[in-house]
């Protein structure tokens, strides 16, 4: 049932009202009380590129200093469906949002009914938590809630980065035992925050990578989240980019190269010498489909793009 999400059908007038409130909060409240700088989703000037640049920059600095960098990549389970309305309203009050806006959002989210028709019977359920899927305000409401977690880890001196409902903890240090202990404490803070806000993290979808160029891993300690031990991986796919433990970019570039070649040959099947699409359309396919595959997050892997040029040649 987790795969089924209710479609939020709202009128043009309501969408317009949501857009006005969204702009009012962004241009007013968030200017006076800005969100944590480590949130990279749904904000002007932020994107997957800025998130990757920020995270990879810290990892590269740790490797250059011959330190360990332990990354734990978390996914908040059903974030938009399970977010607490009370948590949102508390955050909005702390940010100084006006009472009128808070009451309007409270009324909008508290009076929702989901209807399902199985062909045999109809079912109606009152929704008392979560944000409407596809709603104009939903993205802003979630990053307001998630800002509390980012600020909590900031106060305890830990690095936590967010992109929508994807979070990454990164702990750097010269002593591996200390790095593991600090990471475990950070995870405990995440667990506590999730319990307070009615959310959870799926341990099976949580990935842990130890970034290092050292061969010996003396002092490594097992790390748990919600009672389950995390398994250490050699690589992780984060925001569409494969980060390997030594940050060689080999796995990522090979994956992108193979995908681009496969897509190219699929497109080539619809082109012939005397039939098919025109050269102009073929060029458009390359520019619109193939090139974005290769250029995504290209700046973070710039040091290793030479191997792509060799393969292309």
What are these regions (language model features)?
Residues 119, 185-188, 199-234:
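Short, conserved micro-motifs composed of acidic
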Residues 66-70, 202-207, 276-286:
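Short amphipathic alpha-helical interface segments
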Residues 5-6, 39, 43, 69-79, ...:
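Catalytic palm active-site di-aspartate
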Residues 166, 202-214, 284, 307, ...:
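A glycine-rich phosphate-binding loop feature that marks nucleotide/adenosyl-phosphate handling sites
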Residues 1-132, 140, 171:
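Conserved pre-catalytic core of RNA-dependent polymerases
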Residues 76-95, 130, 168-195, 213, ...:
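Catalytic palm subdomain of template-directed nucleic-acid polymerases
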Residues 60-61, 114-115, 151-155, 266-269, ...:
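Conserved helix-loop functional segments at active or binding sites
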Residues 227-301:
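Basic, alpha-helical interaction scaffolds
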